[in-house]
Curated annotation (Swiss-Prot):
Keywords: Golgi apparatus
Disordered: region residues: 111-151
Keyword Transmembrane helix (UniProt): no
Metal-binding keyword on record: no
Annotated organism of origin: Schizosaccharomyces pombe (strain 972 / ATCC 24843)
An example Gene Ontology molecular-function term: phosphatidate phosphatase activity
Superkingdom: Eukaryota
Any one GO cellular component localisation term in the record: actin cortical patch
Any Pfam family matching the protein: APP1_cat
GO biological process: lipid metabolic process
Protein name per its UniProtKB record: Uncharacterized protein C29B5.04c
Subcellular location: Golgi apparatus
Leader sequence residues: none
Length: 605
């Protein structure tokens, strides 16, 4: 979704250099006090600074790759093609609005790309004379008629016609790039508003990082008279993606409200009058001991609908109003935790390029102060496809946990991706630091399990034999499960899962039942026939210290995605130490009471 075509055209364009379009930004980070002894002040402060030096796109002079990128994004999110000249959109049902040139199928294309413009295309027929005017993809039927060219009726010869692409590329791309289904936001907020959001947010896909640029980073402290002074300076060079990172230790300084300020100045500039710099005030200094909340963003605090696929993610990210992406009660829940002196940190697979949009979302959602955020850079479509989401997020989460000293951690995510799997690994690595794991159940909502009523199965004429295997809870009674008799020769084996809560258990305990049904044939020698008999294999796993605060499927479930979620939950419970609770929620109001008790207990100890 974000800029990656440079890898395919390496060397075709000059590397970006510092100019008037160059910008620099600093991302939210926090400092950690270290070396503190009982009854004394800390001796050192761990400084963490992260930023990006990049070049903004020149909207008046976009290259071919940039135009192609925007056009592909338009189709991907369901926007209709935009007219190059007028900025209007053609009607989808009227083919005449897209008609620009009609020629015979024997016409030949002469493409002229000397100026790098895709519209320098001339059409020449085999019967063209010297007096005939040149034809281009921007020649209208009226121009052709005025020059004596016979234009056939498009309704009679649509199969022999060329149409100008609304995306300004070619008729071939018009067939593959015109969205088959328009975005739902066109009908809800209007096409003009969708276009406004798209143009504002899609610019992030065209930003290019500037490598090997030198940045001067200054750390300011504020005294009692509100005067700032520089307490540390660092020179750092940007990496290949344009990012600069500082992880250093400085002597301890007393500052107003225990907050510093950070300024980043780009040392090289083509203009002496313009200094390219970024400034971030109120960078907090956290104690090495305390409680921090590390949360995912997509489908956890922001309704991105990752579970519905990348096309839905692109549509929501680029077109949806920010007030429609909030999740009920989440900001209130986070404010409750910060009122208990917990700090908020975000680790997500969202790209750094989307930070301006995310910052606006957090402000609109009244999210409490963000102490630090860890995102990632999208540097190639191929890498994003091959590299699993868990691998992309694991390193950032590990960096965030290690940078927080000895602080206790509460992990918050969702089951739309692989958050629980990654959090289980972190809990196994830091069993004494993880207080709890909170997972938002978007899978049940997506699958519609709660809306479906389980039909009662009919009893079979034959006796159902139950055979247990791999039962992890011997005390759990085995249960019979039957299905309607169907075509025995064609019906395959079936698998069903069921979550059952054990009554009166502290902490809360669930039993995950697995039923595997299949049919065998038993010979009836008396009647000289073969009768089908259903076999049911049953296994049960005990899930201790699991708290499901939202609605869930209490019946036997055959949905594959829902079954995968149950398996992930059982596997995670086997990896995560039993003293760490796993809490399943959907709305932010549900885990508030549980979280208050958890944090108060942690602070008391």
């Amino acid at each position: 979704m974000f800029r990656s075509f440079g890898r395919l055209f390496r060397g075709s364009e000059e590397s970006p250099t510092i100019n008037d379009l160059t910008s620099i930004t600093i991302y939210p980070q926090c400092f950690i006090s270290t070396g503190k002894e009982y009854g004394s002040e800390p001796k050192h402060i761990s400084v963490h600074v992260r930023g990006w030096v990049y070049e903004n796109p020149d909207l008046n002079n976009l290259g071919r790759k940039d135009r192609l990128m925007l056009n592909l994004l338009r189709r991907y999110v369901g926007l209709p093609p935009k007219s190059k000249e007028t900025g209007t959109y053609p009607e989808k049902d009227d083919e005449n609005t897209n008609l620009q040139v009609v020629v015979d199928t024997k016409a030949q294309l002469n493409v002229n790309v000397n100026d790098g413009k895709p519209n320098d295309i001339e059409l020449s027929s085999t019967s063209k004379t010297e007096n005939d005017p040149p034809l281009s993809l921007h020649t209208t039927p009226d121009d052709l008629q005025g020059n004596g060219v016979n234009v056939p009726n498009p309704s009679l010869s649509a199969s022999r016609s060329w149409y100008q692409s609304g995306y300004g590329i070619s008729g071939f791309f018009n067939r593959i790039m015109t969205p088959s289904v328009n975005s739902q936001y066109i009908s809800t907020i209007g096409l003009a508003k969708c276009e406004e959001y798209f143009e504002e947010r899609s610019l992030a896909s065209l930003q290019r990082g500037l490598k090997d640029e030198f940045v001067l980073v200054k750390i300011y402290a504020t005294d009692k008279n509100f005067e700032q002074k520089v307490v540390a300076e660092f020179n750092v060079a940007t990496n290949v993606e344009g990012y600069f990172i500082i992880d250093e230790v400085i002597p301890f300084y007393t500052t107003k409200n225990n907050k510093f300020s950070v300024e980043a100045v780009l040392l090289q500039s083509t203009s002496e009058d313009k200094v390219i710099k970024a400034y971030m005030s109120e960078v907090p200094v956290l104690d090495r001991n305390g409680i921090s909340i590390i949360s995912d963003i997509d489908d956890t605090v922001k309704n991105t609908r990752v579970i519905e696929g990348p096309r839905k993610v692109g549509e929501t990210t680029l077109l949806a109003p920010l007030n429609t992406q909030t999740i009920e009660g989440v900001s209130d829940w986070f404010r409750v935790m910060t009122n208990l002196n917990a700090t908020v940190h975000f680790v997500s697979n969202s790209p750094w390029q989307l930070w301006p949009t995310l910052s606006k979302f957090f402000t609109n959602d009244n999210m409490p102060y963000i102490s630090s955020i860890y995102l990632r850079h999208f540097n190639g479509v191929l890498q994003n496809i091959i590299e699993p989401a868990a691998a992309r997020k694991r390193s950032s989460l590990l960096t965030a946990i290690r940078s927080l000293g000895d602080r206790k951690i509460v992990l918050i995510g969702d089951n739309g991706e692989q958050d629980l799997q990654i959090y289980a690994e972190m809990a196994a690595c830091f069993p004494e630091r993880i207080l709890g794991i909170f997972i938002r159940d978007v899978m049940s909502d997506f699958c519609g399990v709660l809306k479906k009523q389980t039909t009662k199965s009919n009893s079979l004429p034959e006796v159902v034999q139950t055979k247990p295997f791999a039962t992890s809870t011997p005390d759990t009674p085995l249960k019979e499960f039957t299905t309607t008799l169907k075509d025995v020769d064609n019906e395959q084996a079936s698998e069903f899962y069921q979550l059952e809560k054990e009554p009166d258990t502290v902490p809360s305990t669930f039993i995950l039942h697995r039923y595997y049904t299949y049919r065998i044939f038993v010979e009836d020698r008396a009647n000289k026939t073969r009768k089908p008999v259903v076999q049911v294999e049953h296994a049960a796993s005990k899930l201790e210290n699991v708290h499901i605060l939202c609605d869930y499927c209490k019946h036997k479930c055959s949905n594959i995605m829902e079954q995968d979620w149950f398996v992930q939950l059982a596997r995670a419970r086997g990896v995560i130490p039993l003293h760490i609770p796993i809490v399943i929620w959907f709305n932010g109001e549900e885990p508030i009471s549980f979280t208050e008790d958890l944090l108060k207990s942690a602070f008391a100890s």
